[in-house]
Amino acid sequence: MKNKHSKIIIWILAALSPILCAVTYPFLPQQVPMHWDINGTVSYEGKATFIFMAVLPLLLAGLFIYLPKIDPRKKNYAKFSKYYDYFCMFMMVFLLIANLVVVSESFFPGRISVGIVIQMLVGVLFLFLGNMMPKF
């Protein structure tokens, strides 16, 4: 990551999920929706799984920052560092939205069409990646 501001933004975005978890955890039901199949059927997990979902962005942010340092072809990151930063930020936002959906569905089941939200997010990810890849 070339830009120091990008690192800060990525860490802030990654920290929002654990903050969301800390604020909502005491009020969550014992079973939290974690998985939606292709038909929209919900699988429920214990609250401990939600903690992992909240910590995952922090782990990925650390990995995204550490990977360019250990990659044998680390000099190639200079070619696409701006887009790498954007990708990292997008993934943090993606995971934050996923956590928000889980919290919303925990408190108000059926309020959000999870399949449509995830399809839109994956579609935006492919648009972003398809637009970015020809540039490096």
What are these regions (language model features)?
Residues 2-32, 37-136:
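Feature 926 captures the class I aminoacyl-tRNA synthetase adenylation module centered on the KMSKS loop
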